Amino acid sequence: MEYEVIIGLEVHVQLNTNSKIFSTATNEFGGSPNTHISPLCVALPGTLPVLNEVVLEKAVRAGVALGCEITKFTKFDRKNYFYPDLPKGYQISQFDKPYATKGGIHVLLKGEKEEKFIPLTRIHMEEDAGKLIHSHDPSINRSYVDYNRAGTPLIEIVSEPDLRSSDEAYVYLNELKTILRYIQVSDCNMEEGSLRCDANVSIRPKGEKGFRTRVEIKNLNSFKAVKQAIDYEVEWQKDVYSRGESFKQMTKLWDATLLKTIPMRSKEMSHDYRYFPEPDLPTIQISDSFIEDIRKTLPELPRQKKERYKTELGLPEYDAEVLTSEREIAEYFEEALVIAGDAKKTSNWVKDEILGIVNKENISIQEFAIDPVRIGKLVKLINSGEITGKIAKTIFEDMLTTKDQPETIVEKNGLKVVRDDKALEEIVIRVIESQPESVEGWKNGKDRVLGAIVGGVMKETKGKADPKLVNELILAKLGPLGEKKKV
């Protein structure tokens, strides 16, 4: 039987504010256990929450960027459950009045021409819980609680169950991460827990309406893990149905070592959490002017930027994709382009030479040794014909280890293109005379021999000869292809 895969994703994103969502405690990853805490973080009696306005601002910023409808009146609720990393015995979250609804993300699968729109159900704000640290010493059967993370501001972005494959889920997450980093509400660093994802997976026979029993998968600490877990779970559910059996709604953990999902508990429903309005926080009114002020500060988003690169700058799809993959890369490219004046040449240098080093050394483009202004000047020198592409790579190597401007390196090392017709003509004659077999090949109609002669001239001039002038001089000496002309 052929099945259709149904996937919905819940993505938790930590907001990059200076302080936590309801207290003045530092919002910072790492540090010694229980050092970034306040009395509220550990639920000391008498402490009361106060909403951090910057959290609301960044949350709305994310909602606007994702095309959501921002709720004019929103509130917080208590989500009641017991766990050692939740000292209050409840989490402050949002239940029936999330601050943002609808919206969505466009995804484009590799090899596809048409984008697919993945709608969102909602985005809500909530506080993060603490973290359990388990002893690795088998003789010490003990776990410790670090409350540094407790109270960290989160937004939970919930998609509609409209994803139909692990590939779609992977692309969706990448697009979401790119947007959130563009608008600078989070670094989305999965290794530090800034972005965490739960996947809800079910399958149904093709053509069947309605949804079957779903499984929620947790402990997905990379996009690769999300893809692997979904693929495994789909096959597991197919196997269950093929045997004529069924299963209960449940939560599973992804085991990255065994590469399988493992049952954790039966899946709770909303009534299990006994939600009720948070009595210590007032209803929040979000004005139209507040939303519009935020909308005006949004940068050009990656999808729009990519389209502009293709239509206005004439860049290929691949170039536009690479250059807009991170806001910092796009900014580097655009700053270099202002000086260089040639989009394609600038793109080639950024995506091939620069990102090649950035990826190899596992650094960010902000840490790259050469600033965009110097790269722009280098490309401009190539464009003006003052240096060749080959010489540019030599200059680039110097620029990696010095702060010198490219034009300074050119002058200091005498690297300008040779345009002296007489001097070049003498070199051309000398090279032609040293390659009688190439001359014979040309006379016999073999045009590929031209490259050997050009290469000889470039070698003699150490790559400094004007390639266009060299070609003209050689062709003038050789005559038309296939013609038995005396050279």
Swiss-Prot record:
UniProt KW keywords: ATP-binding, Ligase, Nucleotide-binding, Protein biosynthesis
UniProt xrefs under InterPro entries: Asn/Gln-tRNA_amidoTrfase_suB/E (IPR017959), Asn/Gln-tRNA_Trfase_suB/E_cat (IPR006075), Asn/Gln_amidotransferase (IPR018027), Asn/Gln_tRNA_amidoTrase-B-like (IPR003789), GatB (IPR004413), GatB_C_1 (IPR042114), GatB_Yqey_C_2 (IPR023168), Gln-tRNA_amidoTrfase_suB_CS (IPR017958)
Protein name as annotated: Aspartyl/glutamyl-tRNA(Asn/Gln) amidotransferase subunit B
Record EC number: 6.3.5.-
Subunit architecture: Heterotrimer of A, B and C subunits.
GO MF terms, alphabetically ordered: asparaginyl-tRNA synthase (glutamine-hydrolyzing) activity; ATP binding; glutaminyl-tRNA synthase (glutamine-hydrolyzing) activity
SUPFAM superfamilies, A to Z: GatB/YqeY motif (SSF89095), Glutamine synthetase/guanido kinase (SSF55931)
Single Gene Ontology BP annotation: glutaminyl-tRNAGln biosynthesis via transamidation
Chain's role: Allows the formation of correctly charged Asn-tRNA(Asn) or Gln-tRNA(Gln) through the transamidation of misacylated Asp-tRNA(Asn) or Glu-tRNA(Gln) in organisms which lack either or both of asparaginyl-tRNA or glutaminyl-tRNA synthetases. The reaction takes place in the presence of glutamine and ATP through an activated phospho-Asp-tRNA(Asn) or phospho-Glu-tRNA(Gln).
Catalyzed chemical reaction(s): L-glutamyl-tRNA(Gln) + L-glutamine + ATP + H2O = L-glutaminyl-tRNA(Gln) + L-glutamate + ADP + phosphate + H(+); L-aspartyl-tRNA(Asn) + L-glutamine + ATP + H2O = L-asparaginyl-tRNA(Asn) + L-glutamate + ADP + phosphate + 2 H(+)
Protein family (similarity comment): Belongs to the GatB/GatE family. GatB subfamily.
Gene label: gatB
Organism whose genome encodes this protein: Leptospira biflexa serovar Patoc (strain Patoc 1 / ATCC 23582 / Paris)
Primary enzyme class: ligase
